[in-house]
């Protein structure tokens, strides 16, 4: 467990501060990478630096997947009472989902491999006076978070798992078991995988099989939805997996 010293501002579910989000995007487009505070001091392993640099380059502009607000599936999960603190947001990017959940009273830690994205998320939290925390961290090293004393009753994943390779997915699932105690929930949104031979995307069938092999998990919901991007709306699945 962990706490912050700031009190989050609580607003209405489903109505994030869109004006603030638009201002964030405008400022980032005009001054990419030079208007943000210090990045948390966590060293990125040398093997991951090329990947981090790729995402830094994306976040120097405004990536297509950064729509300035949380995806609707996560808004509805909050309204349904599925989110319990503390919350881990894996692959948090510039922090819109983390900030949304924190603004509604949850303790949230957002992690991402991109130092620039984390700097932007940290600045958003400071500017909006929202008590969310952010850390440069590899989501495939969740056991390292456990070693630092972190556990989470909810892990949210807005389009990170769907880019992983088969081996990375197994490693990530193993890491989830390290940080989610019995009764905890993993909620994942990703582009729909229509062909089970494809390496990209997610499907309820694949998740049921993968978490079933790992043992100790159960799918509690799975439905079709939309993953919104700035210039498109892609078919997606939203799946909840509970730790037994």
Task: Please tell me what each predicted stretch does.
Residues 2-3, 18, 22-28, 33-88, ...:
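Class I (Rossmann-like) S-adenosyl-L-methionine-dependent methyltransferase catalytic domain
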Residues 145-155:
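A short acidic, Gly/Pro-enriched loop at the edge of an enzyme's catalytic core
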Residues 153-167:
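A short SAM/SAH-binding and catalytic strip from SAM-dependent methyltransferases
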Residues 14:
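Short polybasic linear motifs
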């Amino acid at each position: 467990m962990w706490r912050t010293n700031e009190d989050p501002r609580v607003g209405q579910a489903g109505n994030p501060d869109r004006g603030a989000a638009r201002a964030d995007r405008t400022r980032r487009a005009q001054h990419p990478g030079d208007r943000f505070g210090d990045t948390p001091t966590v060293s990125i392993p040398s093997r991951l630096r090329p990947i981090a640099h790729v995402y830094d380059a994306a976040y120097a502009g405004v990536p297509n997947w950064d729509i300035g607000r949380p995806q609707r599936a996560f808004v509805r999960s909050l309204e349904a009472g599925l989110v319990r603190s503390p919350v881990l947001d894996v692959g948090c990017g510039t922090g819109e989902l983390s900030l949304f959940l924190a603004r509604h009273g949850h303790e949230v830690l957002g992690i991402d491999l991109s130092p620039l994205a984390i700097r932007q998320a940290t600045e958003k939290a400071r500017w909006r006076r929202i008590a969310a925390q952010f850390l440069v961290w590899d989501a495939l090293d969740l056991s390292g978070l456990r070693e630092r004393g972190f556990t989470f009753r909810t892990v949210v994943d807005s389009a990170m798992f769907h880019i992983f390779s088969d081996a990375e997915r197994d490693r990530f699932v193993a890491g989830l078991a390290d940080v989610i105690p019995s009764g905890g929930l993993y909620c994942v949104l990703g582009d729909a995988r229509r062909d089970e031979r494809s390496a990209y995307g997610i499907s309820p069938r694949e998740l049921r099989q993968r978490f079933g092999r790992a043992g100790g998990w159960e799918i509690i919901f799975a439905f079709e939805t939309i993953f919104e991007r700035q210039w498109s709306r892609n078919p997606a699945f939203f799946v909840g997996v509970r730790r037994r």
